[in-house]
Regions:
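Periplasmic-binding protein-like
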Residues: 1, 58-65, 124-126, 159, ...
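Alpha-helical recognition/docking segments in bacterial nutrient-uptake
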Residues: 1-113, 178, 192
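Hinge/beta->alpha junction and helix N-cap segments in small-molecule ligand-binding domains
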Residues: 7-19, 38-47, 66, 100-110, ...
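Alpha-helical structural signal in soluble globular domains
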Residues: 24-28, 77, 138-150, 196-204
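Residue-level detector of anion-binding/catalytic polar loops
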Residues: 34-35, 84, 121, 153, ...
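Glycine-rich phosphate/diphosphate-binding loops that line cofactor/substrate pockets in enzymes
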Residues: 112-123
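Flexible loop/turn connectors
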Residues: 170, 174-272
Length: 272
C-alpha cells in the first residue's frame, strides 16, 4: 500500500495536520497485515514517472494536493489505469475516484457563528476562496453562509488569499491590516494560517482577543499551545485514517465504495 503526499510547492515541511492522520493510517494498515510505503511526490506533468511505484502497491492513499485544478488530471490518470486509490480532501460530486473528507462548509459555518455569538461583526477570512482550493473554498462558503444569515455581508476587502503555512498567514494578516478596513475577528482556513496571523497581529500591536478574535481550522497540536491558545475546528484525523484504509481495502476486494464526509467539531479556546 503506497501513501503519497503532494505538498504545496513552497512548503518544504509536512503539514502537521497530516502527521496525526499518518499515525492513524499506519495503525489501521498494521491491523490489516499490510505494509505501508510512504512516497513524497511533487506535482509534475510526467504522470508515467510519478506513478511508476504505484504498480508495485495494492492501492494508494493520497494526502495533500496543492492547486486542485492542476492536480485533478493525476486522478483522471489513476482512474484510466485502473489503480485502486482513495484520497483525503474535498468531496466533490464530479470528482474521479473515491474521497474521504471533512464537512468543511459546516465547520466554517460553526466557527463563524461562534464569533458572531461573541458580538463580532466585521469578520475577515484568510485563505484561498476559489475552486483551485476546494477545501478552503468550502470553509469560506460556510463562513459566508453564517454572515448572510446574520444579515451581514462578506466584503472582498476582508478576504485575503493564503496557503496553509504560518508565513502565508503572517503575510495575509499584515495585508489585511494594511488595507485599513475595520475588522474585529479573523476566520483562518487552517491553524497554520491562524498561528501566523496571531504573530502578525501581535507584531502590529493588536491584542487578541480583546481587539480581534482569531479562529483556525484543523486542531493541530500547536493550536493548544499558541499564544493565546487557538479556537479552532477539529478534523477527526483518527477516524479519517481508519476510513481511508477501510475504503481502500474494500475497493481492493472488489466491494462497492462511496465517498464519506466526516463531521467536524468546534473547539473553543482563549483566542476567540
Amino acid at each position: 500500500m503506497l501513501l503519497f503526499e503532494d505538498p504545496t510547492p513552497d512548503d518544504s515541511l509536512i503539514n502537521p495536520f497530516f502527521l496525526s492522520m499518518l499515525g492513524s493510517i499506519t495503525r489501521a494498515t498494521a491491523r490489516q497485515g499490510y505494509d505501508l510505503l510512504i512516497s513524497f511526490q511533487q506535482l509534475s506533468g510526467d504522470f508515467r514517472q510519478d506513478y511508476e511505484d504505484s504498480r508495485k502497491a495494492d492501492g494508494i492513499i493520497l494526502l495533500g494536493y496543492g492547486d486542485y485544478e492542476e492536480y485533478r488530471p493525476r486522478l483522471d490518470k489513476l482512474v484510466e489505469s485502473g489503480t485502486h486509490f482513495v484520497r483525503w480532501g474535498p468531496v466533490l460530486s464530479d470528482e474521479p475516484g473515491v474521497s474521504i473528507g471533512s464537512d468543511n462548509s459546516q465547520g466554517g459555518y460553526d466557527v463563524t457563528r461562534h464569533l458572531l455569538s461573541q458580538g463580532r461583526r466585521h469578520l475577515a477570512f484568510l485563505g484561498h476562496a476559489t475552486t483551485h482550493y476546494p477545501e478552503f473554498f468550502d470553509r469560506y462558503r460556510g463562513y459566508e453562509r453564517a454572515l448572510m444569515e446574520a444579515q451581514l455581508g462578506a466584503p472582498s476587502a476582508l478576504q485575503v488569499d493564503a496557503i496553509t503555512t504560518e508565513e502565508a498567514g503572517f503575510r495575509a494578516a499584515k495585508e489585511l491590516v494594511s488595507r485599513g478596513v475595520p475588522f474585529d475577528a479573523i476566520v483562518a482556513a487552517s491553524d497554520l494560517i491562524a498561528i501566523g496571523a496571531l504573530r502578525a497581529l501581535q507584531d502590529s500591536g493588536i491584542e487578541v482577543p480583546r481587539q480581534v478574535s482569531v479562529a483556525g481550522f484543523d486542531d493541530i497540536p500547536a493550536a493548544s499551545s499558541a499564544s493565546p491558545p487557538l479556537t479552532t475546528v477539529m478534523q477527526d484525523t483518527r477516524r479519517a485514517g481508519e476510513l481511508l484504509v477501510e475504503t481502500l481495502l474494500r475497493q481492493i476486494a472488489g466491494d462497492p465504495v462511496t465517498n464519506s464526509v466526516i463531521p467536524t467539531k468546534l473547539v473553543v479556546r482563549k483566542s476567540a
